[in-house]
Amino acid sequence: DVGIGNAVSMPWINLWNKHNLYRKDKSVWSDSRQFFAFRDDRRAVFKNPVFHGSRCPEILTKNEIKIDYLKVMHYQFLNLKMERSKQALYQIFERNHYPNKNTEHINKIYAHVFDERSMGLCQLEDEHYIPWVERGIEIDKEYPLDGYNWRDTEVLKNFQKFGVKRYKNINIWYIDWEDKRKKAIKKGFNFTSAIVDPRSLSTKLSHKFLMKYQLYSFWRLDFYKLLIYKFMETVYL
């Protein structure tokens, strides 16, 4: 029984690329828990940021009830192509909503979704997915590694509205956006301007360094600006 003012957390099983494999390693995607439910006390309110807010009012998460006999399977990483487009669109949103936010910090926030260092995968037990497949629910569906989705359209709309240079420092250029533009045209969209990667050599190296090592690029000016900002934040808190 969940008492009034309590929040429920459950194990969060991150499936990876296939419906019957999940992460089991030292990454944030392994052996994690999330809050999935709460019992309202009629006083708690959501005071979350625009992005990445909690599923429960923050004030209730201190009253945690851990449930381990139920586990939540997370399908985010089954359709990796769509997942990569989603991460790009989120970073576009960040750049639009917080134009003064440090781009090195934005990139670092989203880099962990690409972290496959020393990746370990375990087989999901049949009982967790076969009964659903037998009921006609296609949780075993496989997805192509190429293609086009609605999030690509939204990114291209932002390019068309604001220009690509606005987004030159955020880590979204692991996707070939000119190829996406050509696919969009075939679907009837009118994106007329060719898209050329606007990044400098330093920015390209920075993005590669971040993706490979999950570390800030120590040679970038924005990194030192971020350090100063964090220091000042600590001093004045």
Model-derived regions, located:
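N-proximal low-complexity "stem/linker" segments adjacent to membrane-targeting elements
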Residues: Y236-L237
